[in-house]
């Protein structure tokens, strides 16, 4: 019971943070003094933050419905999913003056997954990584072959991932976790990614580096042949 309460507290805190930022931005808008460009920039920030918060709420709803078996598995283009994530997050990267490099090295493009769940996993990895990139050390989204699996990895340059969190990710997160050494990191996002990975029979893992962490998901490759038209 205590663990459930703790998990709910972490989830509530993460969902409260964007609301607080949105309130601050809204209060800072001065329609009499601000230029049109400044007002448009603030509006765009509000839209970006609200979209990310809504996505987390939607993802939590999906987590609660996983046991209903409503999310079908099918051959999915992992490159298409990654491109979709990059397109949706581009305004968020730009507003933070950050960039995410994409490197697609896999020969296999089709995986067996649910497209919505896979999108959410990669999306959460990328939103975590943007906090730990600079123009000199930009984060990297990569796709590579890994035996009968296809691996999607997001490399960041943040503080070392605590051993306890690394072990929890390895064993499968059972509740949202607070990543105190990585204040920009979303424990709720990692929890969602862990749940979705398990549902799709994919493997979620984290690799610690001296100067950051790579969050990865390995998805079963599809034997179906992809045709280009």
Feature map (PLM): residue ranges:
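Conserved C-terminal segment of the DHp
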Residues: 21-36, 66
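Short conserved segment of the HATPase_c
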Residues: 161-175
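Short alpha-helical segment of the dimerization/phosphotransfer core of two-component systems
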Residues: 45-53
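Conserved micro-motifs of the catalytic ATP-binding
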Residues: 67-72, 110-113
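Conserved glycine-rich
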Residues: 201-202
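Short conserved segments within the C-terminal catalytic ATPase subdomain
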Residues: 92-102
């Amino acid at each position: 019971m205590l663990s459930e309460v703790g998990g709910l507290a972490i989830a509530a805190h993460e969902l409260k943070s964007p609301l607080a930022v949105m309130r601050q931005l809204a209060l800072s808008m001065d329609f009499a003094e601000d230029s049109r460009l400044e007002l448009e920039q603030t509006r765009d920030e509000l839209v970006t933050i609200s979209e990310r918060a809504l996505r987390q709420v939607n993802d939590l709803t999906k987590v609660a419905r996983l046991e209903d078996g409503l999310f079908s598995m099918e051959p999915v283009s992992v490159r298409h999913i990654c491109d979709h994530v990059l397109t949706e997050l581009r305004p968020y990267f730009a507003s933070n003056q950050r960039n995410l490099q994409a490197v697609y090295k896999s020969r296999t493009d089709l995986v067996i997954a649910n497209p919505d769940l896979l999108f959410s996993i990669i999306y959460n990895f990328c939103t975590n990584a943007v906090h730990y990139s600079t123009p000199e050390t930009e984060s990297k989204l990569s796709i590579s072959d890994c035996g009968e699996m296809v691996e999607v990895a997001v490399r960041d340059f943040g503080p070392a991932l605590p051993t306890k969190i690394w072990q929890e990710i390895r064993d499968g997160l059972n509740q949202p976790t607070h990543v105190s050494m990585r204040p920009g990191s979303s424990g709720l996002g990692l929890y969602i990614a862990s749940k979705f990975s398990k549902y799709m029979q994919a493997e979620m893992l984290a690799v610690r580096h001296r100067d950051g962490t790579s969050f990865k998901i390995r998805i079963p490759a599809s034997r179906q042949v992809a045709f280009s038209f």
